[in-house]
Amino acid sequence: MEKISDLIECIAYEKNLPKEMISKVIQGCLLKMAQNELDPLARYLVVEENKQLQLIQLVEVLEDDDERLVNDPSKYISLSKAKEMDPSVKIKDELSYSLSLESMKQGAINRLFKDLQYQLEKALEDSHFEAFQKRLNSVLMGQVILVDHNQNTFIEIEQQFQGVLSMRHRIKGESFKIGDSIKAVLTQVKRTKKGLLLELSRTTPKMLEALLELEVPEIKDKEIEIIHCARIPGNRAKVSFFSHNSRIDPIGAAVGVKGVRINAISNELNKENIDCIEYSNVPEIYITLALAPAKILSVEIKKIPIEELSAEEKESIQERFIVNNHLQKAKVRLLDIEKSKAIGKGGVNVCLASMLTGYHIEFETIPSVKENAENENEKETPKVGVEALESLFKN
């Protein structure tokens, strides 16, 4: 047993496995070997004595005429034979025998060592799998080792694991070559015949959230919380923040002095424009903030039962806007000169605002009031944007 213990300690040191795991693996392999090589019906136990593992066979003491002595001799011993070894033994006592590997054939020993190696490798993989499962949605960094013909990028992570960044999880316009360093978020851990495969992404909103947590210490310290995040990767993103500390401005903390924090993140994401928004639990205010830089006059929230929607509406509405079988809809009133800002280039602004807030947004435009010197009745300039919304919710 000493040689086995020395071998396991050596492997454990090389593989950086905990001693408890090693002990469990050894015991399992010894028990398996005993059942396969000695007697599958016997009862075995592995115990630790003087920092060495001992393989023990257990037998129960029975009356001399008990039928189980004939039917199952590997598990039982007669009282008369037991007393020859220990005069004080009684019925139902258990006797134990220490078994030595030296009495076993070389083939059995080789199979034991092979099984130990396999089980240790499996235990190591299980340990790494669990460790990476805990790191899901966190940023990993590695070096490109291969870009295949489908533009899937294979990355060496921590000098022993392989990650893959598929083309569809790559920001549009990005290209990588062997030797490049890459940051990406871990989205899935897979077991393959060659070992663990780490699936990575640079397009998921979780990538932006993870980078913000790395760059903004107030988020890691839980003084600021990311509430929602919406992205069109490589183009534009909107992130809403809430401060749990009244002394900390969540937007100022996220942006940093002269934009140093948010610019660092933008550069990592291929110059993606990132809008930082303060979260509000009042949907009307939240939607108004999300549609910036457009100035909004008012927001009307509607929750429409699905059964009241037409077939065409059901097909066009995205599932993210359906909550408790109701369509979450926001009717936004704004001046006609503000509509293009609210929609944004290619519809990006309104798309991100909808993704961020969870509301299907529709616009109602109001003609702009032009200055007219001949107008007899001078009108007060209406409030717009958040100022207008907040005035509606004041007591």
From Swiss-Prot:
Annotated ranges, domain S1 motif: 137-201
GO-annotated molecular function: DNA-binding transcription factor activity; RNA binding
Subcellular location: Cytoplasm
One Gene Ontology CC term in the entry: cytosol
Sequence ranges assigned to domain KH in this UniProt record: 243-291, 331-378
SUPFAM superfamilies referenced in this protein's UniProt entry, alphabetically: Nucleic acid-binding proteins (SSF50249), Prokaryotic type KH domain (KH-domain type II) (SSF54814), Transcription factor NusA, N-terminal domain (SSF69705)
UniProt xrefs under InterPro entries: KH_dom-like_a/b (IPR015946), KH_dom_NusA-like (IPR025249), KH_sf_prok-type (IPR009019), NA-bd_OB-fold (IPR012340), NusA_bac (IPR030842), NusA_N_sf (IPR036555), S1_domain (IPR003029), TF_NusA_N (IPR013735)
Chief location category: cytoplasm
Origin: domain of life: Bacteria
GO process annotations (BP): DNA-templated transcription termination; transcription antitermination
Keywords per UniProt: Cytoplasm, Repeat, RNA-binding, Transcription, Transcription antitermination, Transcription regulation, Transcription termination
Binding partners and assembly: Monomer. Binds directly to the core enzyme of the DNA-dependent RNA polymerase and to nascent RNA.
Function: Participates in both transcription termination and antitermination.
Family: Belongs to the NusA family.
Protein name per the record: Transcription termination/antitermination protein NusA
Organism: Helicobacter pylori (strain J99 / ATCC 700824)
Name of encoding gene: nusA
